[in-house]
Amino acid sequence: MRQKIAEQIAIGALRYFMLKVTRNSVIAFDFKDALSFEGETGPYIQYAVVRIRNIFRKGNTTPDAALADFANLSAANLGSYLAGDANEDIWSLWLRAGRRTQILEQCIATSEPAYLAKHAFQLAQEFANFYHRHHILTEEDPARKTFLLATAAIALRELVGALALLGIESPEAM
């Protein structure tokens, strides 16, 4: 298992490093930088996926269950969860997650996968901001907790999808 995870991280690091730059860029490859868990790297994005999966594991639920529960929330609750500056990161995360189709169209039109790579990195950053600001598993309001879990589920779905399109596997653990 550890060998498989190490391979996923190494291959993901290399692929992301090669895909994050546009075709006309000069590449100076540094494996140490590519394998870093900080900055614009494949492992940073893979770690975001693992972190989200751990939220669901610790919460004894699944992303699908969170989204099903979210569908049953009242619209009145949603308005209060999105109001105010304190929830700007939630808006940013949902907006970024919803842009994948637009980004893919841009990649196709320009033959540049770098746009999708950048999108995946920015989505991982948006999730990190959201995660640091909102205590998902310890949220006391059940409806708000459902909303936060659904937000994490959307981020997970979009990150895994973006990585898959880049040919990068999403490890179960790191």
Kindly label every feature range from the protein language model.
Residues 1-174:
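Non-catalytic interaction-recognition regions
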